[in-house]
Amino acid sequence: MLSFLFKKEPQEKTQNRSVELTEILKKLKEIYRGCDISEGRKAYLRRIIEKYGYLPYPHIRALEELNAADTLFGLEVKWRLNNVFKNNAFCFSDDEISPVARAGINNSDWIKREQHNIKLINLAALGNGNYSPAPGNFVDWLKQLLILPSGNPEKSILATTIYLIPFHPRDFGCAYLPSSSGISNCVKDDYLTGKLNITAEKQVQLFITFAQLAGHPVIYDILPQTGRFSKEVLAKPEIARWVDVNQLISSIELEIDDIVKTYETKYDFDDVQIVRSVAKATLKSGSDDMGEHYKKIYNDLSEKLLPKRKQISEKMFLKNEQQKITDRVKQIVASVHCTTTDKINTEDDITKQGEVINKLIEEGLWSVPGGAWCSAGVPVFERMSESGDFPLFKHYDYKGNDVSRYANLDCQTPYFFVHLENGEFNRPVINYYVNKVKSLCKMYSFDGIRFDHIDHVVDEFSQKGDRPISYRIPKQVLAKCNSTLKQENKHFAIVAEYMLGGNNIKEYHREMHFDVLWGNDIISQYEKNPYEIIKNNQSLKQYNEALLTKGTVSVLKSYNNQDGEFRDINQYPGQLGEQGDLFKWFKMKFIPGGKKAQRPVMYVDGDESFTTVGTEECIGAEISLKRAKNYTFFEKFDAINRFALKNELTTEGEARIVTQNDNGFVCWTITQNQNNEILLIAANYFAPTEKVFDSENGTTECTIREGMTVFDSSIEVPKEYKIVSEYIYDYNEKEYTENEYKCSGNTLYFDRLEPSEFKFFKLVKQ
């Protein structure tokens, strides 16, 4: 994959990858002055990295304090700790670049492991946004590798998994609307390209390889849709549905004429002619704003026209009609490129993307968009926009209700997986898609993927029985894709964006072969108190212990809930305040589910330093993140993670609720079979401030709930246990350290617990 740096004679045997990478590292040191680092600086970095397995800095500190030489030296230490670097050279087998492979793991259980972390990272955002919005460069990426937390190899907990946001060029500033399968120019490091002639694609490949050698698995977002006029849609028009808006408009105009004929005795003739003219004109552009007198006729016309619109649109989506339009699109694409249709096969053949798009729009040819999260059937053409620049569609759910107000996906192009008129699967498109995903994963050597936008594929909104009825990717396609990827790579892990609606866990796990489900933390942050989390763990345990369940599935715990696109959710973690955010992290690390309910945690770059805004803007605009410089928050965040990774009870035990009161007081324990020790946690589970949603009389109201201090609480410890110590955060050591706890009896008293304050103790069986 990286031999691009070194030209070889045709007969020369391919170099071992470790030799290649050693040469690449040497060249990187040359251009980045990697030798300009003092022995004292080396000793400092070596001591810290060897102690922790990584450099415990927030990314903003790494950006401001580490130069390229520091970064490369630090990574050498980290690679050495991962047994892939010795005597200033890489040393590994070509089939063991992935840390999962090096660990000897031949299944996907590694990503499900309790205490395993998954960090969402946007490469473009890794620059210093506090200084400039310019995207991060290659050295900035490497600084992130250096600071990523390690795991616990003795417990088979791998180091933090990198979850990469799509790095393709995009439309409308949205990472989930790729305009091609290439690499965005915002990700490319021009300096590295100029010095070593490394393309953007090769830079990303090199970063992923370096990450895996540093112990970090890498997964990637996979999309079941593409951009409206992406290169792949132009190269292979048959993978999408298409409309000819000119033909649709002509057909609707005829229907308008027929309906108007029935108005001869119902309305004034001149009024009807005015309304007819407006109705026809607005199909192409302009506004339908008019006075109340005309509006009555117009609304009557629109009501009678609606079923005709549906029929006209549905007819155009029939298999034979789609074939005709696809053939026209192919002819136009070939004509613009001055070639024949048989010469256009891949994205590389699309060299005049803009010209092709303009010509297609001129001819009235548009790929068909998705719809609303709950829409079914085909989109119904309504009209062109007021400016006449793009088509507008109405969307309906499976009951026929208009759900257009939820349609935020009109700018994407779903793949043409199924003929909705009869449920027939479009096998060529399915095979194309599966091979595309497989090739992408092979190109970048991913250890897993996360499937986007699949949270309703098996409920009544998207299928009737087993027959797909919406634009969403069908479960049968997901099953085929996932099983293919797992056959290619036994340790390959697959995450589903499924938020547990409809209780469809078995379909995602047993039928579609997913390993981890997204969970509902995004929409239910305010409900996730310790009691509810433990209840969630128990539900997962019950499923995994069922007789028909083969293997296990996991449900992700999501620390970050940034979902600003949907303001009705609006569950940003920063709203909890610093202490509230720390307690949220603590809950995810100190409420383990036990052997049959293991759950990893996902967080977003910036969370660890209490960066509360900006992530979504960076993902869309491909700019660097403005980061908070809250080192104290980071140090506590990091200390909680390290403690939980090392402790036998948090890695292997199971949390059980002792008591949870409405005033905010909660107590739970973590126990393990055959272990004489238990952890006991007491806390005030209310955050200092939090948005909550109250539903009453069919309406939902969002309010700000302020947490209150809990006074005079106590808990009785069973007589067979003795309270021996309390773990208290040491600001000097930046660790939770064990301190002897002197207690005359077996009652723990708490005079006061502030909102989100937590305490934890070790109890030993007497």
Positions of predicted regions on the chain:
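Active-site neighborhood of glycoside hydrolase catalytic domains
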Residues: 298-316, 325, 420-502
